[in-house]
């Protein structure tokens, strides 16, 4: 059966096919991004069903608004949250119950493309092959499907792998302000997982600035993470729900990105990186929706369902026996208050934290990961082994001692330190520089070829520095190199250059 959704404009080609399972309702009330829709008795949609409003507004512009059912109010009414702006809607408009939750395209067709919350491409590169679709709402994997083996997710980035290793299928919080290299670190991780693990990445921009989303897309094209000539060779799919969009879109865009990632894990059996920037905006959007739905606010004005909403999202991000989703989530901390319910609820789910330091970025040490503030639950001898654990602890102790001595050095100078402390400072400065490394995605800016450093090579390099074997080498030799052999080769080159100058 085909019906015209706007009898007042009978000549318009806005027909929607309605099968046996699709019911028709009418808008009864509009409160901003929230709609109340009346349905015939016995024809009520289920919670989370998608509703579609089609028609023309008073100016004759075409309207196509998708909503999601949130509450069944009684009296044959449902309350739904719109995924796009509700301007132009009016009471009495026809609404179609699609009979299922929102479904989005998944699989290889999503690579190199930008989508909105509904899975519609927004990059002007034409339609997407959407023969393979998946609903955004689903249960977390059952216990029996989970892979409980603790294993390190090697990133090829020295500072991360040594001091705050990521767990395969774990969740990592990425803390960093503007301009400290968060985007470059994200792009390098996307590049490395594709090369070393044969994996792909999904980036979910949740409530971020449109400008930042555009900049990220442009930088990904420039660095080769997105291949414009052959989109199938791209390593990432992007899903954006920007700050200017209604709270419904910002609340669900994380689930859209997660659904795409789950397909790569479960069907393609790949290791997937899922980036969520920013997880706080997901909570913030949920808070707005909760208030619009008339729920009583909880602590600090947040939604009473905060823990449930966060848990529903986070529990789907996990390792199964087929593949893994490793999630890196940027975390905004309101007013730097770590006890705020939003970041506090997020911390309960994190396996590791990567903290970016403005001080290190100012020194030109990239990636600017703070080696003392970054933490990981994986850094235990029974998981990473004694050698890795001992090396990491010695590196941290050396850097901590250097940090303590910096005030004395600033006031009295290096000469006033004991011989032992001077040796510690010299080694700490070498370690600090050896924690930097050239990135593949930054080759176009730096001119230095990127380096992927395996975990065994990383441990060997830091052990040799700590043992004092390279005390005679200049600290500049350790700056922006890959493994320790490159540092010794660079030291030889520096020595030859200085001799030639003389």
Swiss-Prot record:
Keywords: ATP synthesis, ATP-binding, CF(1), Chloroplast, Hydrogen ion transport, Ion transport, Membrane, Nucleotide-binding, Phosphoprotein, Plastid, Thylakoid, Translocase, Transport. Gene3D superfamilies: 2.40.10.170, Bovine Mitochondrial F1-atpase, Atp Synthase Beta Chain, Chain D, domain 3, P-loop containing nucleotide triphosphate hydrolases. It is a peripheral membrane protein. SMART domains: AAA. One of its GO terms (biological process) is proton motive force-driven mitochondrial ATP synthesis. One of its GO terms (molecular function) is proton-transporting ATP synthase activity, rotational mechanism. It is found in: Plastid, Chloroplast thylakoid membrane. The keyword Ligase does not apply. The keyword DNA repair does not apply. It catalyses: ATP + H2O + 4 H(+)(in) = ADP + phosphate + 5 H(+)(out). InterPro entries: AAA+_ATPase, ATP-synt_VA_C, ATP_synth_F1_bsu, ATPase_a/bsu_AS, ATPase_alpha/beta_chains, ATPase_F1/V1/A1_a/bsu_N, ATPase_F1/V1/A1_a/bsu_N_sf, ATPase_F1/V1/A1_a/bsu_nucl-bd. ATP binds at residues 176-183. GO terms for cellular component: chloroplast thylakoid membrane; mitochondrion; proton-transporting ATP synthase complex. The modification Phosphoserine is found at residue 17. Its main location: plastid. Its EC number is 7.1.2.2. PANTHER family: ATP SYNTHASE (PTHR15184), ATP SYNTHASE SUBUNIT BETA, MITOCHONDRIAL (PTHR15184:SF71). F-type ATPases have 2 components, CF(1) - the catalytic core - and CF(0) - the membrane proton channel. CF(1) has five subunits: alpha(3), beta(3), gamma(1), delta(1), epsilon(1). CF(0) has four main subunits: a(1), b(1), b'(1) and c(9-12). Belongs to the ATPase alpha/beta chains family. Produces ATP from ADP in the presence of a proton gradient across the membrane. The catalytic sites are hosted primarily by the beta subunits. This is ATP synthase subunit beta, chloroplastic. It comes from Lepidium virginicum (Virginia pepperweed). The gene is atpB.
């Amino acid at each position: 059966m085909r019906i015209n959704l706007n009898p007042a404009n009978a000549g318009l080609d806005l027909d929607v096919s309605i099968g046996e399972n699709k019911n028709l309702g009418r808008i009864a009330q509009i409160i901003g991004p929230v709609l109340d829709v009346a349905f015939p008795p016995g024809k009520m949609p289920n919670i989370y069903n998608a509703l579609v409003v089609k028609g023309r507004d008073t100016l004759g512009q075409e309207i196509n608004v998708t909503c999601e059912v949130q509450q069944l109010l009684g009296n044959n009414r449902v309350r739904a949250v719109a995924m796009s702006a509700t301007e132009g809607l009016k009471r009495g408009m026809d609404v179609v119950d699609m009979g299922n939750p929102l479904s989005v395209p998944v699989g290889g067709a999503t690579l190199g493309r930008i989508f909105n919350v509904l899975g519609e491409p927004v990059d002007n590169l034409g339609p997407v092959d959407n023969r393979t679709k998946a609903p955004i709402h689903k249960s977390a994997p059952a216990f029996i499907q989970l892979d409980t083996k603790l294993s390190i997710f090697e990133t090829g980035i020295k500072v991360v792998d040594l001091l705050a290793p990521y767990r395969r299928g774990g969740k990592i919080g990425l803390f960093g302000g503007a301009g400290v290299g968060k985007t470059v670190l994200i792009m390098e991780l996307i590049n490395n997982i594709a090369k070393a693990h044969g994996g792909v990445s999904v980036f979910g921009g949740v409530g971020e600035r449109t400008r930042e989303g555009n900049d990220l897309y442009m930088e990904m094209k420039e660095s080769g993470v997105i291949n414009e000539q052959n989109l199938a060779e791209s390593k990432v799919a992007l899903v954006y729900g920007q700050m200017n969009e209604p709270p419904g879109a910002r609340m669900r865009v994380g689930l859209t990105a997660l659904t795409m990632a789950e397909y790569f894990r479960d069907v393609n059996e790949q290791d997937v990186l899922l980036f969520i920037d920013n997880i706080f905006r997901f909570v913030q959007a949920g808070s707005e929706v909760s208030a619009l739905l008339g729920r009583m606010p909880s602590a600090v004005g947040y939604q009473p369902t905060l823990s449930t909403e966060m848990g529903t999202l986070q529990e789907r991000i996990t390792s199964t026996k087929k593949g893994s989703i490793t999630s890196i989530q940027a975390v905004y901390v309101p007013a730097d208050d770590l006890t705020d319910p939003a970041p506090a609820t997020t911390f309960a789910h994190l396996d590791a934290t990567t903290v970016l330091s403005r001080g290190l970025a100012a020194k030109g040490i990239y990636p600017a990961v703070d080696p003392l503030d970054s933490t990981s639950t994986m850094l235990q001898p029974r998981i990473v082994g004694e050698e890795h654990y001992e090396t990491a602890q010695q590196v941290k102790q050396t850097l901590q001692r250097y940090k303590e001595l910096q005030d004395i050095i600033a006031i009295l100078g290096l000469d006033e330190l004991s011989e032992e402390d001077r040796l510690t400072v010299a080694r700490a400065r070498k370690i600090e520089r050896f924690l930097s490394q050239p990135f593949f995605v930054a080759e176009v800016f730096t001119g230095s070829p990127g380096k992927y450093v395996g975990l065994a090579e990383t441990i060997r390099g830091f052990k040799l520095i700590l043992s004092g074997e390279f005390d005679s080498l200049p600290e500049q030799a350790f700056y922006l190199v890959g493994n320790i052999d490159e540092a010794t080769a660079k030291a030889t080159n520096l020595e030859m250059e200085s001799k030639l100058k003389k």
